Amino acid sequence: MDIQFTEEQELLRNSVQRLLKDEYDFDARRRIVVSEDGWSRTHWKKFADMGLLAAPFAEEFGGFGEGALATMIVMQEFGRRLVVEPFFETVVLAGGLIEAEGTDAQRREHLTGIAAGESIWALAWAEPGARYDLNNVSTTARRSGDHYILSGAKAAVIGAPWADRLIVSARTSGDRRDRQGVSLFIVDRQSAGLHLQSFKTIDGRRAAEITMKDVQVPAAALLGGEGEGAAILEACRDRAIGALCAEAVGAMSELNSATLDYAKTRKQFGVALGTFQVLQHRMVDMFIAHQEAVSLTQHLTLTLASKDSGTTKLASGAKTKVGYAARFIGEQAIQLHGGMGMSDELVVGHYFKRIGAIDIQFGDSAFHLMRFAHTN
């Protein structure tokens, strides 16, 4: 599959490529990752000024109205450069949820802030011991007059240390693993009773364990219908998978390019590595795996853009196949670079860490293979 992009979409891609080529090379990224904040507010402002943070949203909210296609374009280019700024967490996850499920007031208030780069968000859905089960929620939300009172814990919330606001899943009714009874709430990160324990992830980002004790939010902070959060998160997961697959495709492309360049210049036994036929075959296999991942990602993106039902099976199939392809390409790139492939001084090791992190977000390849098998 090969998507024919419109002139506007090509302009978006070219703009992102130029910005990242000029200002987000490997050395610049490394400085950002080891900084105290771990991300660049300067680059975030530039993303906002270029319209990247608004690109997926409808025009009425200052966006381009390009939806999943804009997300794919931006995420693929971000994957090429290992961008750490919270586009995925803020725009794809939170912004996507607010645009899809928010009230008119919530959309007007929050989407414009996201598009302008004025607010950072994170999605707190995973819980200790719950693995990838969206229904496995023990955090509670108790109605008290015009407010809800939230108590519980969330695990490995990516981007939470950077966020101003969180979208939190909590149970308003039912038992821990019931599909019904999960609700979503917009929570200010500075709320009384909410505590973060921050840590660095293997791919250079930031995450946090979150505990909440009697955190009070207004009733208007409910996002979507009460008790309908699990179904909402299922749709969010499919959109998230489309974005993550695009990022992985971008990273795989750079791994292939770096490996090919290395094979052309690194000499062994007096000749370039690339002259050995067995290594040529291996790099062809890497190229084929990447092209298969590109096709599946584009297919999923077009399905998401058309808003057709039944994306669950396709999303899980893509997550599985792209996950396997990314791991294969990453492992081969490391092997062909030798022991130095995993050193911090060489970029391929950083790509390998990122694609490993992508694989476990919203369910790893094994989880989605099982989900694919059990979905009609």
Task: Cite the ranges covered by each PLM segment.
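Short Ser/Thr-interspersed hydrophobic loop/turn segments at strand-loop and sheet-helix junctions
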Residues: 51, 75-79, 170, 187-191, ...
